Amino acid sequence: MSNSLAVVRLDPGLPLPSRAHDGDAGVDLYSAEDVVLPPGQRALVRTGVAVAIPFGMVGLVHPRSGLASRVGLSIVNSPGTIDAGYRGELKVALINLDPATPIVVNRGDRIAQLLVQRVELLELVEVSSFDEAGLAATSRGDGGHGSSGGHASL
């Protein structure tokens, strides 16, 4: 498998996705448009690039931690998933989580980060039950959504 990612620059006025520091896992994605996000609102924001994720890998679009913590800018479907077969422009579903202040995103602002990771492409096999399939019960069972205990103050 290659260690390169094919990128098409759809907007020549924007930089290619890039790492802020050597060794960073993600590459920063830039906004291709000016957007004002009122409190609680969301927008699908163009990045001006398309990528060809290699087969057996997935692209994951994550919020930039500084923007999330400082101004409440996040991603609606975090992380966004880019499948290997998708070849269109990357778009980021941004949301303003601040309860009072609009967020202004300017063209050229770094708005998200793209991580590319290997993914196991498992074959789905229908079984009538996990016991019949020889998959032993676990201590967790079907417990979910807080079944392992809450926060000390809740």
Swiss-Prot record:
Top class in the EC scheme: hydrolase
Binding site residues for substrate: R64, S65, G66, N77, T81, I82, D83, K91
This protein's record includes keyword Hydrolase: yes
Keywords: Hydrolase, Magnesium, Metal-binding, Nucleotide metabolism
Gene3D superfamilies in the record: 2.70.40.10
Coiled-coil parts of chain: none
EC identifiers of the protein: 3.6.1.23
Disulphide connectivity of cysteines: none
Pfam families reported in the protein's UniProt record: dUTPase
Catalytic activity entry: dUTP + H2O = dUMP + diphosphate + H(+)
More about this protein: Each trimer binds three substrate molecules. The ligands are bound between subunits, and for each substrate molecule, residues from adjacent subunits contribute to the binding interactions.
Subunit structure: Homotrimer.
HAMAP family, per the entry: dUTPase_bact
Name of the featured protein: Deoxyuridine 5'-triphosphate nucleotidohydrolase
Organism of origin: Mycobacterium marinum (strain ATCC BAA-535 / M)
Organism taxonomic ancestry: Bacteria, Bacillati, Actinomycetota, Actinomycetes, Mycobacteriales
Gene it is expressed from: dut
